[in-house]
Amino acid sequence: MKINREIPVRQRNIVLIGFMGVGKTTIGQLVAKKLYRDFIDVDQEIEKKYNMTIPEMFQQKGEAFFRQAEKDYIVDLCEHTQLKIVSLGGGAFKQEEIKRACLKHCTVLFLDLSWENWKQRLDILIENRPVLHNRTLDEMKELFEERREIYSLHNSRVETDHLEAEEVANYIVDTLKLGWDLYSK
């Protein structure tokens, strides 16, 4: 059954986008708890569906296979659900169909982090991020800047530099509630 997508703004899925390692999953879980909504990490759901990790999928089936699975899952989620907090993988928003579906049916929040602060997280990120493997720091910065441009289409940008996940989640919840109050009158 397809949901009528002319739903009130407060019932839309909240989609978190941003570069890998910015904290989409951690912050998304906190926001979901505070708003009493279900949390969906797209990468984790794809891993469950195919019974393999994203790095294994890249290695065994290729990036194209993963990107197709990602697109199918996200577009369906946007078109057929509501009241979810959704964390997209860092590269998902590169796909136009995903971007269109998210912007049409959901509220999209860009979690932004400076290159300098992201670089400090690199040691804990690199192992499980196949797209970073075999890249120099300059190539990673180029990817970071390229993706940042892709994330420029969003409903709201949330600066995360020097903030704890809890602080970011509280800011998001407060901002959403204010917006919902304004749009429901």
Swiss-Prot record:
Localization terms from the record: Cytoplasm
One Pfam family here: SKI
Binding site for ATP: 21-26, 129
Pathway(s): Metabolic intermediate biosynthesis; chorismate biosynthesis; chorismate from D-erythrose 4-phosphate and phosphoenolpyruvate: step 5/7
Coiled-coil residues: none
A GO term for molecular function: ATP binding
Listed CDD domains: SK
Transmembrane segments: none
Residues at which substrate binds: 43, 67, 90, 147
Family: Belongs to the shikimate kinase family.
Protein name: Shikimate kinase
Organism for this UniProt entry: Bacillus pumilus (strain SAFR-032)
